[in-house]
A protein has these predicted regions:
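Canonical positions in the second alpha-helix
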Residues: 46-47, 80-82, 114-116, 148-149, ...
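Canonical tetratricopeptide repeat
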Residues: 60, 94-95, 128-129, 161-162, ...
């Protein structure tokens, strides 16, 4: 188990290594052993304690923070690495992934393109680059990249992203077929994706039935309030809602 005290120490190191960047959130990790992301972050922070200008350690820390879903910290680490080593393609990919997940897709796509020009293969970026395209409403490019990612071993999250993108494109048959194996396996996030996809396709009642009966009570209730609005959103807004949980204000719909 990683204690709060240890995470607090990590936060201090982050503040030292990333000048002015948001600190890593302190939280109790209730697990018998630290996960891979936590171990990777702990190792990177130890190296930064010895040398705060260790670019590789900063990049490792940024990637670990992404694994732990601490996007602000990841941006801080990658930003500091970019100051020390401008134009590093690994930094471009890391920042692009973080910007995608913080709903900054235009900046992300620019950085993905920079990384590609620097020689980073699309297979290394396909999953998150696909999401960035979905977040600007380009579902065709997104789906091409999701399939590339799946051909190279990407997992269930990419399957769910592809299915939702197909629903956004209006292809219900493909949406259902893509999601079915995960639904058969009882994958709860797949049921969430199904609810969003059905709502996008105009079947809000079935979507709300799923939200209210299959998903955890709190999540289902929060989702149900938005499902009626999904067909009225732009493609980019639908992708942001279904993938990131980012909704426009109802007054602006």
């Amino acid at each position: 188990m990683i204690s709060t005290r240890r995470l607090a120490a990590a936060t201090v190191l982050l503040a030292l290594a990333v000048q002015g960047a948001p600190a890593l959130a302190q939280r109790e990790i209730v697990q018998p052993l630290p996960g891979a992301g936590e171990q990777k972050l702990s190792d990177a922070l130890s190296r930064l304690a010895r040398n705060s200008q260790d670019v590789t350690a900063l990049l490792d820390a940024g990637e670990a923070a992404l694994e732990l879903d601490d996007i602000d910290a990841a941006i801080g680490f990658f930003g500091r690495a970019n100051e020390l080593s401008p134009g590093n393609p690994r930094t471009s990919v890391g920042l692009a992934r973080a910007y995608t997940r913080s709903h900054r897709p235009i900046e992300a796509l620019r950085l993905f393109a920079e990384a590609e020009r620097a020689g980073v293969p699309d297979t290394r970026m396909a999953q998150d680059r696909g999401l960035a395209f979905d977040l600007v409403g380009d579902a065709a490019s997104a789906q091409q990249l999701y399939r590339l990612a799946l051909d190279n071993g990407a997992g269930a999250e990419t399957v769910r992203r592809l299915a939702l993108s197909q629903a956004i494109s209006g292809d219900r048959e493909a949406f259902e077929a893509t999601l079915l194996p995960l639904l058969r396996d009882g994958d709860v996030p797949a049921f969430r994706t199904r609810a969003f996809g059905l709502a996008v396709l105009g079947d809000a009642e079935e979507a709300k039935d799923i939200a209210n009966t299959v998903l955890p009570a709190g999540l289902g209730a929060r989702m149900a309030a938005y499902l009626d609005y999904m067909p009225r959103l732009t493609r980019a807004q639908q992708a942001a809602a279904g993938n990131l949980g980012v909704f426009p204000r109802t007054s602006s719909i």
